[in-house]
Amino acid sequence: MDIQGQNIVIIGGTSGIGLATAIAAQKAGANVWSASRSTDKVSLCQTKHPEIQFSQVDTHDPEGLKSLFQSAGRINHIVGAATGADRTMLPFMEQTDEQFREAFNKFWGYTNVVRQGVP
């Protein structure tokens, strides 16, 4: 797939698969905006990868997401790489109600991403 010149927003893009995707997309010629709720991770990544636009935003903050998407302009691709795997690593019957709630909260975050990111 040719992504040269396309605008890509990556949610959860400061570590793991999200960061690897951001780096690969930028090397392939895409314009990349990479977001994380961690200010520390955003600062570190911006220093290491100045060719990528890193932003601090929480998926539960619709206004923050709106600002991110507006800065990216016309969006060609949205990548959702934000996880929360540490909340769901136990076998099903060993997880607490709170762990289930936290895992399901990711759904609401991604709902906000789609609502704000899709024209």
Please place each PLM-identified region on the residue numbering.
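Amphipathic alpha-helical dimer-interface segment in Rossmann-like NAD(P)H-dependent oxidoreductases
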Residues: N105-P119
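Rossmann-fold scaffold of SDR-type NAD(P)-dependent oxidoreductases
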Residues: I11, I75-G84
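Conserved glycine-rich Rossmann-like NAD(P)H-binding loop of the short-chain dehydrogenase/reductase
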Residues: A28-S43
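Conserved mid-core segment of classical short-chain dehydrogenase/reductases
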Residues: T83-R101
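N-terminal Rossmann NAD(P)H-binding glycine-rich loop of SDR-like oxidoreductase domains
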Residues: T14, A22
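Conserved Rossmann-fold cofactor-binding substructure of NAD(P)-dependent oxidoreductases
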Residues: H60-G73
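Rossmann-fold cofactor-recognition segment
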Residues: K48-P62
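Flexible N-terminal pre-Rossmann segment of NAD(P)-dependent oxidoreductases
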Residues: M1-V9
